Amino acid sequence: MFGYFYNSSFRRYATLMGDLFSNIQIKRQLESGDKFIRVPITYASKEHFMMKLNKWTSINSQEDVAKVETILPRINLHLVDFSYNAPFKTNILNQNLLQKGATSVVSQYNPSPIKMIYELSIFTRYEDDMFQIVEQILPYFQPHFNTTMYEQFGNDIPFKRDIKIVLMSAAIDEAIDGDNLSRRRIEWSLTFEVNGWMYPPVDDAEGLIRTTYTDFHANTRDLPDGEGVFESVDSEVVPRDIDPEDWDGTVKQTFTSNVNRPTPPEPPGPRT
């Protein structure tokens, strides 16, 4: 709309969700001992994943080609919906500042809150495999789970935020009926709500005030201790080159009379 920028926000949330469910395992009891199998996770739409299971090279295909069977269990993750998250709205005029150098400061306005809906589809051939997978997920969502991520990692203004993930619903689809040639497939779908943020572009901050000059235009004022009169009050942050987010509110003030303001090439600062 108003110039190119890209903060990879959607990609980061998809990576977060994929990483969250990437270490799920099932256990198979064999004569030689227990065998643990890590369940692979794929980011794709549910329809695309089902087409892959039933494609013309599948084990059930009648085509005269080499058959390749999709290995189960597998997990499929997909973003299905998103909307504006009004309860998390903040003041759109607030800015985050970061000093990049002695004279360079970048700023960014508050992000826009969004609510993303992810669907996690689990496909197995055996009921016990499904129980093992789901029981490694459900205990952590009561009904929400908080995790921490760096939003805009590697950008000018990185931000560490707690992300709330809520388990909304579950749907069970078990293909109990079928002919002798079809393979049994069990499918459970879990729906999650993720509270996220979309960030605006980062711009150079202009007009960052570190020194102020106040003149009373020939009207004199008494000093608080009664030691003299003044017509100008100057204030400056201490130290002058401090980062805005590190400033503790310390200010240096001077009271002067008949002293001109510094002009370039003189450096700015309180008059003495």
UniProtKB/Swiss-Prot annotation:
Biased composition range(s): Pro residues: 262-272
Keyword DNA-binding: no
Subcellular location: Virion
Keywords: Late protein, Virion
Record has tRNA processing as a keyword: no
InterPro entries for the chain: T4-gp15_tss (IPR031997), T4-gp15_tss_sf (IPR038553)
One Pfam entry name: T4-gp15_tss
Source taxon at top rank: Viruses
GO cellular component, one term: virion component
Chain residue ranges for the region called Disordered: 240-272
Principal location class: virion
Bias (Polar residues): 251-260
Subunit and partners: Hexamer. Interacts with gp3 and gp18 on the bottom part of the hexamer. Interacts with gp13 and gp14 on the top part of the hexamer.
Biological role: Stabilizes the tail sheath structure and acts as a connector between the end of tail and the portal vertex of the capsid.
Protein name: Tail completion protein gp15
Organism lineage: Viruses, Duplodnaviria, Heunggongvirae, Uroviricota, Caudoviricetes
